[in-house]
């Protein structure tokens, strides 16, 4: 069975800059509303169907959570749905913030 891959926040940012990669944030709505990575799509149970309809299976998908734990399960789920290049962002949003990468705040 295919597996997701791990990627650090710098690698994730580089992939976003040089490809058609999509960044999805699976944190709770309140956390996402307060602050999230620039260009992040809030992936929830309610938005998963529209996301899967809008994204090509060949597009790289980066999955972000709080610390890089929950994103692994979500990344594997996306692999199981047929997405070919899925990455779990190690360290999650916390690492993204620590690395001072682009963030949108409410």
From Swiss-Prot:
Function (record text): Transferase that catalyzes the transfer of sulfur from thiosulfate to thiophilic acceptors such as cyanide or dithiols. May function in a CysM-independent thiosulfate assimilation pathway by catalyzing the conversion of thiosulfate to sulfite, which can then be used for L-cysteine biosynthesis.
Organism, as annotated: Vibrio campbellii (strain ATCC BAA-1116)
Gene3D superfamilies given in the database record: Rhodanese-like domain
CDD domains named in the record: GlpE_ST
Domain Rhodanese: 17-105
Keywords in alphabetical order: Cytoplasm, Transferase
Single Gene Ontology MF annotation: thiosulfate-cyanide sulfurtransferase activity
UniProt similarity note: Belongs to the GlpE family.
Catalytic activity: thiosulfate + hydrogen cyanide = thiocyanate + sulfite + 2 H(+); thiosulfate + [thioredoxin]-dithiol = [thioredoxin]-disulfide + hydrogen sulfide + sulfite + 2 H(+)
GO cellular component: cytoplasm
A biological-process GO annotation: glycerol metabolic process
UniProt protein name: Thiosulfate sulfurtransferase GlpE
Domain of life according to the entry: Bacteria
Entry's EC annotation: 2.8.1.1
Disulfide bonding pattern of the chain: none
NCBIfam families in the record: PRK00162.1 (NF001195)
Pfam annotation, one family: Rhodanese
Location of the active site: 65
Lineage: Bacteria, Pseudomonadati, Pseudomonadota, Gammaproteobacteria, Vibrionales
Subcellular location: Cytoplasm
SMART domains found in the cross-reference section: RHOD
Keyword Cytoplasm (UniProt): yes
